[in-house]
Amino acid sequence: MSRIFARTIGLIVVALIIGEGVLRGIGIPHTLDSGWKWENSPGRKSSKYNDLTTNQLGYRGQRIHYDTDDYVVVLVGDSGLEAFAGPPEHMPEQFLLKSLSSRFTKPVKVFSLAASGWGQDQQLLAVQEYFKTYRADLVLLWPTLGNDYWENAFPDRSPTPEAGHLKPTFRLIDQELHGPYFRSGSYWHGSAVLQLAESAIAKISKETLEQRILRNWIKAMPAPHESEKQAHEGLCEGLTVIDQREFYRDIFELDPNIGYTLKSGDDFLNSRGFFSPYMSDSSERDRYLIRITQMLLKRIKEEVERHQAKFLVFHAPREEFDRRGARMVKCVSDSQGSIFRVSFDYEGLLKNIISSDDLVIIDLPWGEGNKHVVSPEDRHLNDIGNEQVMERLAVSLMERSLFDR
């Protein structure tokens, strides 16, 4: 009986190996479509400047070319650096190049590694990709502090319960980063056979493969919130209720002396949203977002320094987000009707996860109004805003004596 069992197991293993080879050979199922650069960027889809103007690595921006004596600066980020609302010649890399070149006699080159919707997980992979071929003297990372934390924790890009586009990401286990998982061109579970089986189950369940991947991923994450509707409903009573998009669109027309509850479509119960790192009563999963972001930034810094370059993170506090919005928003409600108290301090949290030696805070007198943003509905910085940030960043770098004049 034992010989028959062993022979049966052996035949199954051989069949699986043969099946794996056959499936890979005929391309069924397709490998994972994971991550994105400029060609498939969410920003490009909504931009009127959507030509495939990219560097050699596929990111929006000028071609990567430098001479031996050039001081090479690499900007790393997301939609802020991709600047999809404007032409390529008005990207932050161009403004920073102009500002640095006017201050230093040594030739300077500036290049971008950025795409809309990126967190530090895809940024880390981009930095690793860059250093396989190119060098840098300085790497500057521009975080988006309302999005990066939750983006870093999940294998998809969506703040709702519905799974978004798949992306490569990492998992934090016992304070160690593991991954990346779900790299483009790979198979889920590392197997075409297993991915085909998962796809069949997903089809029977009338869901996407991405939704199945997300559900599987979430099971291994720290504990989420229980429903906070009853716990916080009384604390948020009497606040002015307003849609989140409407709030930020009209923020300079609203009364800054009263508190607001923002209605959001985000999935705060599962820590998938703009305010998740800033919950007054945070869940284990909320705190996990912060820890994994800290570890990803640490890994990026290590990668940069391993290639003999300097690493800095810079943040330009915004009037509508860091100051006015932080004072006015007291509560948020999510897509499932749960209500949460929030208290957010972008700069304060950033200072908790980044050493002051590696952080540049760019204070600008933004004032009230929308002259520095694309539009009231789209609060990405426009050419005016980006030029001001890059000008002040250049001054800050000069003050740190990072360049020879």
Regions found by a protein language model. Name each.
Residues 146-351, 367-372:
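Serine-dependent acyl-ester chemistry module
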Residues 120, 124, 290, 294, ...:
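Short, amphipathic alpha-helical "lid/cap" segments that border enzyme active or binding sites
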Residues 112-114, 315-317, 363-365:
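Residue-level recognition of beta-strand->loop/alpha-helix junctions
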Residues 1-72, 87, 133-137, 149-153, ...:
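N-terminal secretory targeting modules
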Residues 5-7, 377-405:
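Histidine-centered active-site loop/cap adjacent to the catalytic His
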Residues 24-104, 127, 236, 246, ...:
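Membrane/wall-proximal cationic-aromatic binding patches
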Residues 80-86, 112-116, 286-290, 339, ...:
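Second-shell loop/turn segments in exported
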Residues 72-74, 80-166, 240-261:
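Conserved SGNH/GDSL esterase-like catalytic core that processes O-acyl groups on lipids
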